[in-house]
A protein has these predicted regions:
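Interfacial loop-to-transmembrane junctions
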Residues: 156-178
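Short alpha-helical packing/oligomerization segments
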Residues: 7-10, 121-157
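Transmembrane alpha-helix entry/boundary detector in multi-pass membrane proteins
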Residues: 42-48, 68-85, 105-113, 136-141
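Small-residue-rich segments of transmembrane alpha-helices in multi-pass membrane proteins
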Residues: 49-52, 111-123, 171-183
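C-terminal ends of transmembrane helices
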Residues: 28-38, 92-103, 154-162
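N-terminal topogenic module of multi-pass integral membrane proteins
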Residues: 1-78
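Juxtamembrane boundary at the C-terminal end of a transmembrane helix
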Residues: 181-192
Length: 192
């Protein structure tokens, strides 16, 4: 598919699509496991959560392979800087959300920051490989920031919402991430 760019871009593309699928599995799990006023069997919730985790692990694996195997034709931002920014960002958000706003810390904060870091590294890789232009890269950096800010807002207000509003609030970040990943895959496909 990406013969001009080698197998690295094809692997990265598969990882991006798999992360969109992971978001879809997570949506199904959330919809079943947290549906208000209905209890589902624990085994069903478990199967859906395992499917979500499997998709996520495959996605990160393929994306990491594509990132580290990609041939660079121009300078990008060092991956270490993006990772360090993610660690610092996570600690700051953890302190602000928990100590300042007294919001219980959950896995979702880690997932939001982790997705942002991974997505920014992917955008940087696509730029450095020559597949994304300055404009493409800027667009996806802005899109990543919008999704992160909106997801953090949903994260912060979740426990203050009544059942049905909280249920819907939990869907929003997953939908946004899925759309962002599909948009990135589309632009990659068009630029190949």
């Amino acid at each position: 598919m990406f013969s001009n760019y080698g197998t690295a871009m094809g692997t990265l593309f598969k990882g991006i699509l798999m992360l969109a699928a992971c978001s879809g599995c997570y949506l199904v799990w959330w919809g079943v496991a947290f549906y208000p006023e209905r209890h589902v069997p624990l085994w069903l919730s478990g199967i859906l959560l395992v499917a979500t985790a499997a998709c996520g692990i495959m996605a990160v694996n393929w994306m990491a392979q594509g990132i580290f195997q990609a041939e660079k034709v121009r300078a990008g931002i060092p991956v270490g800087w993006i990772l360090a920014g993610g660690v610092i960002g996570y600690v700051v958000l953890l302190v602000i959300s928990n100590i300042v706003f007294h919001r219980m810390v959950t896995t979702e904060l880690f997932l939001i920051v982790g997705w942002a870091v991974l997505n920014l590294i992917v955008v940087d890789t696509l730029y450095a490989s020559g597949l994304f232009s300055d404009g493409d890269s800027s667009l996806f950096v802005v899109l990543t920031l919008i999704v992160v800010v909106a997801s953090l807002y949903c994260y912060m207000i979740y426990y203050d919402l009544e059942k049905w509003k909280g249920y819907i609030d939990g869907f929003l970040p997953l939908v946004m991430v899925g759309i962002a990943m599909l948009a990135m895959a589309r632009v990659m496909f068009l630029r190949k």
